[in-house]
Amino acid sequence: MAKIRVYELAKELNISSKELITLLEEEFSVEVKNHMSAIEDEDANLIKELLSGKEKSEKTKEEDDEIETTAKNPIKESMNNKKSNKRDDKNEKVNTENAEDMGIITMTSDTITVKEISDKLEKSYAEVIKELMLMGVMASVNQEINFEMAEKLAAKFDMEILKEDEDEKEDLEDILKDNEEEEYLQKRSPIITVMGHVDHGKTSLLDAIRKSKVTSTEAGGITQHIGAYTVELNGEAITFLDTPGHAAFTAMRARGAQVTDIVILVVAADDGIMPQTQEAISHCKAANVPLIVAINKIDRPGANIDKVKQELTEYGLVAEDWGGDTICVPVSAHTKEGIDDLLEMILLSSEILELKANPNRKAKGTVVEAKLDKGRGPVATLLIQNGTLRVGDSIVVGSTYGRIRAMFNDKGRNIESAGPSTPVEILGLSEVPEAGDKFYQTKEEKTARGIADKRKEKIRDEYLQSTHKVSLEDLYNQIQEGTVKELGLIVKADVQGSVEALKQSLEKLSTEEVKVRVIHGGVGAINETDVTLATASNGIILGFNVRPDNNAIIASERDGVDIKTYRIIYDAIEDIKSAMVGMLEPEFKEVVIGTAEVRQVYKISSVGTIAGAYIQTGKLARNAGARVIRDGIVIFESELASLKRFKDDAKEVAQGYECGLSIEKFNDIKEGDIIECFIMEEIKKKTL
């Protein structure tokens, strides 16, 4: 049901928002928080009827009152006369005037720049900066101030600033929340990503599966644009993504998009595990996605399946026929041998995963890839993960939006609708989205546009606040906040021996409290792929006798990834040790710093009980812990609320002196009580 904001209805009825809010609460028992709150159209119509009835009775009562009212409300007449094609611009102007009359402005985020608040207050930058200076805040035009400061500043200009209520914001997940009970769910097709080393036959394998020749049309044998395909086996569909390879797979995961159900790792039988194969394994483990190994090129003379299985064990992947749980399927893209076995294994794995979705709800999913086409405008390949998408539907995609003008399947045919696990290419977006952006279907385009605008504003705010990834220097703080549970590392070195040495040494540092996990180890310079993996896994990159290339440096600065390089292995290990020592939970010990005997008690009505005490041992310190001991039994434990020497506040009072004190939240002090003062000292851990 459509809604209307309070200030808009007030303007339409020619009454103040305050009057309308009172009317809503008293006449209709509708609670609204402020003029930005939204109410149902049904309630709005009832109010209009009520007020129109009142107006008629007032007209019959006294015509002079009506003339006087009209004189007092010239806006109503001007509004009625000016309803025309220029309505949008004038509404905007009247809305602003309405807000000004009430002296209320709003802000949607936690902070606002001096420039923005000056514009909202309609004051010069100099005036606002001057007021801030008088409040003890030195700020430039582009500097941000928090809500509390903005509130005080607005009050100086006789204005009120309100933070837009979170309940009023259109939360997309709530808008699109559908019933996902078991009865609504239906089985869906598995979504497969193909990964592996270059030239190991990923595209040829996809080609063999689709039973069509596409490899020959590609430049240099490298995948240019395959996108996503759906194939069928025994009446069951399987969706394949080639995005291409693990770079885009991780880029999407870094943006929070987990689209893949199963990964097919292609390994050449005559080549074995190669650097990109290692990277692919690391990515799968980091994403916690099931993996099926397709041992390709078994028709080659030098093929050695057992050697590949042996090499896989070094990365924790033990084949099923070797007693492990990794499915390994020997295949040949050239002779089509083993293709059906591979597809059967995919379907078997998907059955175990119990993949389900609700096709009878609003669609949602992920952008696989997107581009700007000269003739067609923004084009996006979407993977529908839930619901059904139709031509004409309005969607919000990341920080862009649109209405679907046309939709094509993986074979390039024009289609009207698509269900879960279906890849489609769509036209009609306002801008080009990014791979990994999530899309949601909305009721109307206006809603989608509103959400997209809010997201753009949020992205801008996040950029200004410059949030950073994990670094060795701030690991302790992040552990304390509970944002980091383990230390993830990516190790690169000049030779494989150094990689293994570092991995073993670093993983041995793991304790019950702090876990060190080497996400990926490889030989060669630190590249952009390493930075992407670190971004997705919130990890740190360690380089031994290697340096990051230019692209990696740019990416690390952009994404806030910490890169550390060393020439001595010992230095790397010591740095990690130091970071982990900081990460360990601190231990504390109690240190009694003094005792005092209560000699006299004073009861003051406005303050409570004050004890006059004599320091027997050590000293008493303000804000230190305090125990009240009576006849050798601890009867209360808190802290010293106040400590005085004569009439003056004292930070501490030493042995042999008298003092006045009070205990936080305790008034039952009696003469003869012993006050034991203590502090908690941290015991710093020096070793793991």
From Swiss-Prot:
Gene it is expressed from: infB
Presence of the UniProt keyword Repeat in the record: no
Function summary: One of the essential components for the initiation of protein synthesis. Protects formylmethionyl-tRNA from spontaneous hydrolysis and promotes its binding to the 30S ribosomal subunits. Also involved in the hydrolysis of GTP during the formation of the 70S ribosomal complex.
The protein's name: Translation initiation factor IF-2
Ranges where the record places region G4: 296-299
Organism: Clostridium botulinum (strain Loch Maree / Type A3)
Ranges where the record places region Disordered: 53-100
Residues annotated for GTP binding in this entry: 196-203, 242-246, 296-299
Listed Basic and acidic residues bias regions: 53-62, 86-95
